[in-house]
Amino acid sequence: MNKRGNINEYIRSLVASPRMAGEVVHHEILRRRPARECPASFPAGDLVRTILEGMGVQSLYTHQAEGITHIRQGRHVVVSTPTASGKTFIYNLPVLERIKAAPSARALYLFPLKALAQDQLKAFERMAAVAGLSDTATAAIYDGDTSDYKRKKIRGSPPAVIMTNPDMVHLSLLPYHDSWRTFFENLEIIVIDEIHTYRGVMGSHMARVFRRLLRVCAHYGANPVFVASSATIANPGELAGQLTGVRVNTVENSGAPRGRRNVVMLNPRTGP
């Protein structure tokens, strides 16, 4: 029996179950959605094509092309599309383009979890290697687990991309910005991953941190572009704007494919 048959049989059994039947209050089928790739007219550029071919990717999705266009044109943007829709490409590709064009260009990646930073470091280094930019498109993690020796080394000679978290920006970068002068002078792109996690008291705190960050950048003559990624939420542009204090463009219409899905809602008669 194929997978669809297994799922249909499972749902029928669930609805017919003497114990669960009355608890199933809704069943809906979401049809599959094919991928929507960016048009052939999109100016990908030689570097992007090289990276995509090297990673076995045939084409960018429409939302990826839209996000990259905003970044290339110096516009702040938040991308709110489902998990595994390729948001990493949206900021890594323009960052690599900028480093190739100007090796002094710098980027700051902010992640709420250390595990995310580790994963993204590997992804960035792989793209840089495919692009032949491993020598210039360097990256390093700067967080609470970074040894004192390595921190001093990073401060003395910052890599092209620093991957850290908001707390480290607040406690270790901004108060000692004179030690990071070279980095801030050349900072062009600030990536805020999982921006939807910054809400409530934490969100209020981060709004102040981002404003301090922009003031420090302006002090050193830099005007970086914010690139935020978010899970699918109702108001990504409003949230990103409130956090950063700047006008943020929104990319929400995902071009990534989606398989057929069954949505089943239960209303349990008793608690756990």
Task: Describe each model-derived feature in a short phrase.
Residues T69-Q73, T88-P103, R211-L214:
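Walker A/P-loop NTP-binding motif
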Residues T88-F89, A105-R126, A231-P236:
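Conserved Walker A/P-loop ATP-binding site and its immediately adjacent core
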Residues L96-D119, D135-T136, A218-A222:
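Conserved SF1/SF2 helicase motif Ia
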Residues G144-E188:
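Conserved helix/coil segment N-terminal to the catalytic DExD/H
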Residues L116-D143, Q242-V248:
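Conserved helix-turn-beta segment of the N-terminal RecA-like "Helicase ATP-binding" lobe
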Residues V225, S229, I233, G237-P272:
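Conserved interdomain linker/interface between the two RecA-like ATPase lobes of SF2 helicase motors
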Residues Q64, S80-S85, E194-M202, F210-L239:
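Conserved helicase ATPase motor motifs in RecA-like P-loop NTPase domains
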Residues M1-A65, R75-H76, A137:
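Helicase-associated low-complexity/disordered flanking segments
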